[in-house]
Amino acid sequence: KELKPVLENEGAYEVSISPSESVIAYRYSTSNRPWELYVSKLKPGAEPFQITSSTTKEFDKHDWMKPEFIDFEADDGTTIYARVYEPKADRKNGAAVFFVHGAGYLQNAHHFWSGYFREYMFHHLLVEKGYTVLDLDYRASDGYGRDYRTAIYRHMGGRDLDDYIDAKKFMVENYDLDSNRIGIYGGSYGGFITLMALLTKPEEFACGAALRSVTDWSHYNHEYTSNILNY
């Protein structure tokens, strides 16, 4: 029997099937719309029924951007993935802001609603002001395999930061950016990378904002740190 897809829209689904296997309930989101709950008959072409509506009228007034999903080759040959938010040509100012997600091992270059929804809305504001925004899944981000995940073993602020330097070269060459007008920011591990960028690569970034950053790993969560630094 030929298998046919039931859910085909761009985005992400989390699905539960009824005991009778005739109905599904699922959670669905896209890169610019948050998660909502739906039910549908389990057959191709079935019309879903939306159960929840979690956005406000104020939220729905905005034409929230869908990011461009890109990839490029780092200097060691590894493919790196990212989201790019680009302003319209008449607003573009040639400057850029690079965002560093937290935890090290998270993933943000995906097609569904990000846990970084506050930053997403901030990036939307930056784009309206003319800035290009890069949201990078740097080395050690989740979902790209063992070698990717362990690339920062015993050297946090090494290969992961290098990916931002390589990203800068790519963005300047392909998005008409001024290499002297690129800033970087992030929180937690993203704050740590921001500090490493400003302190060890000051010639690369015009400015940075390190939010709630880790500054001394010896006083951070031992279970997290020991797995990476192996002490």
Q: What kind of feature is each model-predicted range?
A:
Residues 2-8:
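Blade-edge beta-strand/turn elements of extracellular beta-propeller
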Residues 7, 14-231:
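Serine-hydrolase catalytic core recognition
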